């Protein structure tokens, strides 16, 4: 059961990552004139909606509503990581150091996904 849930979560995260980045292209976010927190929040909301759907699936199976607290922590962590790395990514693109921007973008996605998987697995094992 744990393996099935973890697999579904991983697939949801990967699908979300692809779909979320297609709906709000990172290039548009990175080329924004000002460091707008609303753009970051909008990106995270679209990125997080399928994860929220996964939480409702989890609630339907286990009748445990505290999974929503896990989702909120992941949401907050994602906003913080996006905000902290956003300025670095924008300056890298402005200076035409695209390799740095790509490293930071994938690094931030790796951090968020790792945080989600570790905290989810820890939550299930309790």
Where are the language model's segments positioned?
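Interhelical loop and helix-boundary elements at the membrane-water interface
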Residues: 22-47, 79-120
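N-terminal signal-anchor/start-transfer transmembrane helix
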Residues: 8-26
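Helix-coil boundary and interhelical linker segments in multi-pass alpha-helical membrane proteins
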Residues: 1-9, 52-70, 117-126
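Alpha-helical transmembrane segments of integral membrane proteins
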Residues: 4, 8-12, 38-42, 65-73, ...
